[in-house]
Amino acid sequence: MVDREQLVQKARLAEQAERYDDMAAAMKNVTELNEPLSNEERNLLSVAYKNVVGARRSSWRVISSIEQKTSADGNEKKIEMVRAYREKIEKELGAVCQDVLSLLDNYLIKNCSETQYESKVFYLKMKGDYYRYLAEVATGEKRATVVESSEKAYSEAHEISKEHMQPTHPIRLGLALNYSVFYYEIQNAPEQACHLAKTAFDDAIAELDTLNEDSYKDSTLIMQLLRDNLTLWTSDQQDDDGGEGNN
Protein backbone atom coordinates (compact mmCIF):
# COMPACT_ATOMS: atom_id res chain seq x y z
CA MET A 1 0.00 0.00 0.00
CA VAL A 2 1.40 3.38 -0.99
CA ASP A 3 1.74 5.81 1.90
CA ARG A 4 -0.35 8.86 1.04
CA GLU A 5 1.62 11.22 3.29
CA GLN A 6 4.90 10.08 1.72
CA LEU A 7 3.56 10.84 -1.76
CA VAL A 8 2.41 14.31 -0.67
CA GLN A 9 5.80 14.91 0.95
CA LYS A 10 7.48 13.85 -2.29
CA ALA A 11 5.29 16.31 -4.23
CA ARG A 12 6.28 19.15 -1.85
CA LEU A 13 9.94 18.22 -2.25
CA ALA A 14 9.65 18.04 -6.05
CA GLU A 15 8.01 21.49 -6.07
CA GLN A 16 10.93 22.98 -4.14
CA ALA A 17 13.34 21.35 -6.60
CA GLU A 18 11.17 22.60 -9.50
CA ARG A 19 10.86 19.02 -10.80
CA TYR A 20 7.26 19.35 -11.88
CA ASP A 21 7.02 16.04 -13.77
CA ASP A 22 7.90 14.24 -10.51
CA MET A 23 5.48 16.45 -8.60
CA ALA A 24 2.65 15.65 -11.04
CA ALA A 25 3.41 11.90 -10.92
CA ALA A 26 3.26 11.92 -7.10
CA MET A 27 -0.03 13.85 -7.03
CA LYS A 28 -1.49 11.60 -9.73
CA ASN A 29 -0.75 8.64 -7.43
CA VAL A 30 -2.39 10.45 -4.51
CA THR A 31 -5.50 11.13 -6.62
CA GLU A 32 -5.69 7.49 -7.74
CA LEU A 33 -5.96 6.40 -4.09
CA ASN A 34 -9.54 7.56 -4.72
CA GLU A 35 -10.01 9.65 -1.57
CA PRO A 36 -10.97 13.35 -1.55
CA LEU A 37 -8.02 15.75 -1.69
CA SER A 38 -7.40 18.35 1.01
CA ASN A 39 -7.07 22.00 -0.10
CA GLU A 40 -3.29 21.71 0.05
CA GLU A 41 -3.28 18.50 -2.01
CA ARG A 42 -5.66 20.05 -4.52
CA ASN A 43 -3.32 23.00 -4.95
CA LEU A 44 -0.25 20.74 -5.25
CA LEU A 45 -1.97 18.81 -8.05
CA SER A 46 -2.96 22.03 -9.82
CA VAL A 47 0.50 23.65 -9.55
CA ALA A 48 2.26 20.48 -10.72
CA TYR A 49 0.23 20.02 -13.89
CA LYS A 50 0.06 23.74 -14.61
CA ASN A 51 3.87 23.79 -14.81
CA VAL A 52 4.09 20.54 -16.78
CA VAL A 53 1.57 21.71 -19.37
CA GLY A 54 2.87 25.30 -19.23
CA ALA A 55 6.32 24.23 -20.44
CA ARG A 56 4.74 22.47 -23.45
CA ARG A 57 2.41 25.39 -24.24
CA SER A 58 5.35 27.77 -24.20
CA SER A 59 7.45 25.46 -26.43
CA TRP A 60 4.54 25.06 -28.84
CA ARG A 61 4.13 28.83 -29.21
CA VAL A 62 7.84 29.30 -29.95
CA ILE A 63 7.92 26.48 -32.53
CA SER A 64 4.67 27.66 -34.18
CA SER A 65 6.17 31.10 -34.62
CA ILE A 66 9.34 29.59 -36.13
CA GLU A 67 7.17 27.43 -38.41
CA GLN A 68 5.39 30.50 -39.80
CA LYS A 69 8.70 32.24 -40.51
CA THR A 70 10.16 29.08 -42.07
CA SER A 71 7.12 28.65 -44.33
CA ALA A 72 7.73 32.15 -45.68
CA ASP A 73 11.36 31.20 -46.51
CA GLY A 74 10.21 28.18 -48.52
CA ASN A 75 12.98 25.80 -47.36
CA GLU A 76 11.10 22.47 -47.64
CA LYS A 77 13.53 20.37 -45.55
CA LYS A 78 13.52 22.86 -42.71
CA ILE A 79 9.74 23.30 -42.91
CA GLU A 80 9.27 19.53 -42.55
CA MET A 81 11.64 19.33 -39.58
CA VAL A 82 9.93 22.20 -37.75
CA ARG A 83 6.47 20.74 -38.46
CA ALA A 84 7.50 17.32 -37.13
CA TYR A 85 8.90 18.93 -33.97
CA ARG A 86 5.69 20.94 -33.44
CA GLU A 87 3.66 17.75 -33.79
CA LYS A 88 5.88 16.01 -31.21
CA ILE A 89 5.23 18.83 -28.73
CA GLU A 90 1.49 18.71 -29.51
CA LYS A 91 1.46 14.98 -28.72
CA GLU A 92 3.15 15.59 -25.36
CA LEU A 93 0.79 18.46 -24.55
CA GLY A 94 -2.21 16.33 -25.50
CA ALA A 95 -1.03 13.45 -23.30
CA VAL A 96 -0.64 15.74 -20.27
CA CYS A 97 -4.10 17.25 -20.80
CA GLN A 98 -5.71 13.82 -21.20
CA ASP A 99 -3.97 12.70 -18.01
CA VAL A 100 -5.49 15.57 -16.04
CA LEU A 101 -8.92 15.23 -17.66
CA SER A 102 -8.99 11.50 -16.77
CA LEU A 103 -8.14 12.27 -13.13
CA LEU A 104 -10.88 14.91 -13.04
CA ASP A 105 -13.58 12.70 -14.57
CA ASN A 106 -12.67 9.39 -12.91
CA TYR A 107 -11.86 10.63 -9.41
CA LEU A 108 -12.01 14.32 -8.54
CA ILE A 109 -15.31 15.61 -9.96
CA LYS A 110 -16.93 12.22 -9.47
CA ASN A 111 -16.08 12.17 -5.75
CA CYS A 112 -17.39 15.66 -4.96
CA SER A 113 -20.49 15.55 -2.77
CA GLU A 114 -23.48 17.77 -3.60
CA THR A 115 -22.43 20.37 -1.03
CA GLN A 116 -18.70 20.55 -1.85
CA TYR A 117 -19.22 23.60 -4.03
CA GLU A 118 -15.69 24.96 -3.69
CA SER A 119 -14.05 21.70 -4.79
CA LYS A 120 -16.58 21.19 -7.60
CA VAL A 121 -15.93 24.67 -9.02
CA PHE A 122 -12.16 24.21 -8.63
CA TYR A 123 -12.20 20.92 -10.57
CA LEU A 124 -14.68 22.06 -13.24
CA LYS A 125 -12.53 25.15 -13.80
CA MET A 126 -9.53 22.84 -14.22
CA LYS A 127 -11.51 20.79 -16.71
CA GLY A 128 -12.33 23.93 -18.68
CA ASP A 129 -8.67 24.98 -18.57
CA TYR A 130 -7.26 21.70 -19.89
CA TYR A 131 -9.79 21.48 -22.71
CA ARG A 132 -8.84 25.10 -23.49
CA TYR A 133 -5.16 24.12 -23.71
CA LEU A 134 -6.15 21.35 -26.15
CA ALA A 135 -8.15 23.90 -28.16
CA GLU A 136 -5.07 26.12 -28.49
CA VAL A 137 -3.33 23.49 -30.63
CA ALA A 138 -6.26 21.62 -32.20
CA THR A 139 -7.78 22.23 -35.64
CA GLY A 140 -10.95 21.35 -37.52
CA GLU A 141 -13.53 19.04 -35.97
CA LYS A 142 -11.26 18.09 -33.07
CA ARG A 143 -10.99 21.75 -32.12
CA ALA A 144 -14.77 22.22 -32.23
CA THR A 145 -15.21 19.23 -29.88
CA VAL A 146 -12.67 20.37 -27.26
CA VAL A 147 -13.94 23.98 -27.42
CA GLU A 148 -17.45 22.72 -26.68
CA SER A 149 -16.18 20.60 -23.75
CA SER A 150 -14.26 23.57 -22.35
CA GLU A 151 -17.28 25.87 -22.60
CA LYS A 152 -19.50 23.27 -20.92
CA ALA A 153 -17.15 22.83 -17.93
CA TYR A 154 -16.60 26.58 -17.48
CA SER A 155 -20.33 27.29 -17.77
CA GLU A 156 -21.27 24.69 -15.14
CA ALA A 157 -18.58 25.97 -12.77
CA HIS A 158 -19.72 29.57 -13.37
CA GLU A 159 -23.34 28.77 -12.45
CA ILE A 160 -22.34 26.96 -9.24
CA SER A 161 -19.92 29.73 -8.23
CA LYS A 162 -22.53 32.47 -8.72
CA GLU A 163 -25.03 30.60 -6.60
CA HIS A 164 -22.82 29.37 -3.76
CA MET A 165 -19.66 31.50 -3.50
CA GLN A 166 -18.88 35.10 -2.55
CA PRO A 167 -17.92 37.35 -5.51
CA THR A 168 -14.58 37.93 -3.73
CA HIS A 169 -13.74 34.23 -3.39
CA PRO A 170 -10.42 33.60 -5.18
CA ILE A 171 -11.70 30.43 -6.87
CA ARG A 172 -14.77 32.25 -8.24
CA LEU A 173 -12.56 35.13 -9.41
CA GLY A 174 -9.98 32.77 -10.94
CA LEU A 175 -12.74 31.01 -12.83
CA ALA A 176 -14.06 34.32 -14.21
CA LEU A 177 -10.52 35.25 -15.27
CA ASN A 178 -9.93 32.01 -17.19
CA TYR A 179 -13.45 31.79 -18.61
CA SER A 180 -13.13 35.33 -20.00
CA VAL A 181 -9.74 34.43 -21.53
CA PHE A 182 -11.47 31.44 -23.16
CA TYR A 183 -14.03 33.79 -24.75
CA TYR A 184 -11.37 36.23 -25.92
CA GLU A 185 -8.67 33.88 -27.20
CA ILE A 186 -10.52 30.69 -28.15
CA GLN A 187 -14.02 31.86 -29.12
CA ASN A 188 -12.84 35.19 -30.54
CA ALA A 189 -15.71 36.86 -28.66
CA PRO A 190 -14.23 40.04 -27.12
CA GLU A 191 -17.59 41.48 -26.05
CA GLN A 192 -18.52 38.38 -24.05
CA ALA A 193 -15.00 38.27 -22.58
CA CYS A 194 -15.18 41.90 -21.45
CA HIS A 195 -18.70 41.52 -20.07
CA LEU A 196 -17.73 38.48 -18.00
CA ALA A 197 -14.51 40.03 -16.68
CA LYS A 198 -16.16 43.39 -15.89
CA THR A 199 -19.10 41.77 -14.09
CA ALA A 200 -16.75 39.64 -11.95
CA PHE A 201 -14.57 42.66 -11.13
CA ASP A 202 -17.51 44.98 -10.33
CA ASP A 203 -19.27 42.34 -8.19
CA ALA A 204 -16.07 41.79 -6.19
CA ILE A 205 -15.50 45.55 -5.72
CA ALA A 206 -19.07 45.93 -4.46
CA GLU A 207 -18.43 43.31 -1.77
CA LEU A 208 -14.86 44.08 -0.77
CA ASP A 209 -15.91 43.97 2.88
CA THR A 210 -16.51 40.21 2.52
CA LEU A 211 -12.86 39.63 1.62
CA ASN A 212 -11.47 36.83 3.72
CA GLU A 213 -8.16 37.73 5.41
CA ASP A 214 -6.60 34.41 4.38
CA SER A 215 -7.40 34.90 0.72
CA TYR A 216 -7.03 38.70 0.55
CA LYS A 217 -3.77 38.52 -1.40
CA ASP A 218 -5.05 35.92 -3.88
CA SER A 219 -8.35 37.72 -4.49
CA THR A 220 -6.83 41.16 -5.02
CA LEU A 221 -4.17 39.75 -7.35
CA ILE A 222 -6.83 38.10 -9.56
CA MET A 223 -8.91 41.30 -9.51
CA GLN A 224 -5.85 43.15 -10.77
CA LEU A 225 -5.42 40.59 -13.58
CA LEU A 226 -9.09 40.96 -14.53
CA ARG A 227 -8.65 44.73 -14.70
CA ASP A 228 -5.43 44.43 -16.74
CA ASN A 229 -7.18 42.19 -19.26
CA LEU A 230 -10.16 44.54 -19.48
CA THR A 231 -7.85 47.49 -20.16
CA LEU A 232 -6.02 45.56 -22.87
CA TRP A 233 -9.15 44.12 -24.49
CA THR A 234 -11.11 47.38 -24.56
CA SER A 235 -8.16 49.21 -26.13
CA ASP A 236 -7.88 46.40 -28.72
CA GLN A 237 -11.56 46.80 -29.56
CA GLN A 238 -11.19 50.57 -29.90
CA ASP A 239 -8.24 50.02 -32.26
CA ASP A 240 -10.37 47.63 -34.32
CA ASP A 241 -13.27 50.08 -34.44
CA GLY A 242 -10.93 52.85 -35.53
CA GLY A 243 -9.66 50.98 -38.56
CA GLU A 244 -10.35 47.70 -40.22
CA GLY A 245 -11.12 44.89 -37.79
CA ASN A 246 -8.44 42.23 -37.62
CA ASN A 247 -10.65 39.44 -36.27
Swiss-Prot record:
Main subcellular localisation: cytoplasm
Compartment annotation: Cytoplasm
Pfam families named in the record: 14-3-3
GO biological process: protein localization; signal transduction
Annotated positions for site Interaction with phosphoserine on interacting protein: 57, 132
Sorted UniProt keywords: Cytoplasm
Domain of life: Eukaryota
Family per record: Belongs to the 14-3-3 family.
Name of the protein: 14-3-3 protein gamma
Organism: Gallus gallus (Chicken)
